[in-house]
Amino acid sequence: MNNHFKCIGIVGHPRHPTALTTHEMLYRWLCKKGYEVIVEQQIAHELQLKNVKTGTLAEIGQLADLAVVVGGDGNMLGAARTLARYDIKVIGINRGNLGFLTDLDPDNAQQQLADVLEGHYISEKRFLLEAQVCQQDCQKRISTAINEVVLHPGKVAHMIEFEVYIDEIFAFSQRSDGLIISTPTGSTAYSLSAGGPILTPSLDAITLVPMFPHTLSARPLVINSSSTIRLRFSHRRNDLEISCDSQIALPIQEGEDVLIRRCDYHLNLIHPKDYSYFNTLSTKLGWSKKLF
């Protein structure tokens, strides 16, 4: 064992139970190598592990040096929103479909992770968005997002009329099905499907991407990540929501605004030493191949 990482957390709830074999393999391999291992409580229960140290995501964030997320991008997003609050590095083993954020191949995870544990890795700081639904002099409802915050109707699809203010200065108004506010990390997710630009992860920028705007002039807008975005609504309705990473929904009540800004903390995401962002674009999203 080396001094780069001493305590390692195993997290992630895969969609298919067969993927739990990766969790068990990882646990036994790390224990054999002499690491202190904390297993997320639900995983330990499903694997029926005996005499194992377990913890919540928050406890793993407090106690571990590295969290290994086993699953797909959804598992990574769910875990990362909590783990980003703590001084812990995060890496993923892909047991999902796309695996854009989970780099390690499950068939070669031991060798790749062994190199990482020896200190051979690339580190990135990925910022999050904080979304607040609030009314003056009322309690705020707050959530965070790694990928994006999306304004959309609740149950029935319909046009929304809203205004966008950036740093409290009017930017534009719009009639559309909604708005995607994306981080660089999320620029290859829902935002990409809606025609938004790809932002490399190191950019300090936020994109605003209209969803089916009822105009020929609406275009995606890229702003500095230090800006605060305020959404105001012309016709007060009780059926609007914002979604964070398509996992958490906050309803918007009559008279409420939505504030979106960069979080004060960030996710410490790490990759294998041979990681290339543009190679990932090519292999995962079919980005243009070399001609010569």
UniProtKB/Swiss-Prot annotation:
Q: Which reaction does it catalyse?
A: NAD(+) + ATP = ADP + NADP(+) + H(+)
Q: What is its EC number?
A: 2.7.1.23
Task: Could you list this entry's UniProt keywords, alphabetically sorted.
Answer: ATP-binding, Cytoplasm, Kinase, NAD, NADP, Nucleotide-binding, Transferase
Q: Does the keyword Membrane apply?
A: no
Q: Which SUPFAM superfamilies match?
A: NAD kinase/diacylglycerol kinase-like
Q: What InterPro entries does the record point to? A: ATP-NAD_kinase_N (IPR017438), ATP-NAD_kinase_PpnK-typ_C (IPR017437), NAD/diacylglycerol_kinase_sf (IPR016064), NADK (IPR002504)
Q: What positions does UniProt annotate as the active site of this protein?
A: 73 (proton acceptor)
Residues the entry annotates as binding NAD(+): 73-74, 147-148, 158, 175, 177, 188-193, 247
Its cofactor is:
a divalent metal cation
Query: A Pfam family matched by this chain, by name?
Result: NAD_kinase_C
* Cross-referenced Gene3D superfamilies: Probable inorganic polyphosphate/atp-NAD kinase, domain 1, Probable inorganic polyphosphate/atp-NAD kinase, domain 2
Q: Which domain of life is it from?
A: Bacteria
Name where it's found. Answer: Cytoplasm
The principal location of this protein is cytoplasm
GO CC terms for this protein?
cytoplasm
Q: Name one GO molecular function term.
A: NAD+ kinase activity
Give any single GO term for biological process.
Answer: NADP biosynthetic process
Function of the molecule: Involved in the regulation of the intracellular balance of NAD and NADP, and is a key enzyme in the biosynthesis of NADP. Catalyzes specifically the phosphorylation on 2'-hydroxyl of the adenosine moiety of NAD to yield NADP.
**Membership in a protein family:** Belongs to the NAD kinase family.
Q: What is this protein called?
A: NAD kinase
**Organism for this UniProt entry:** Shigella boydii serotype 4 (strain Sb227)
Q: Give the organism's phylogenetic lineage.
A: Bacteria, Pseudomonadati, Pseudomonadota, Gammaproteobacteria, Enterobacterales
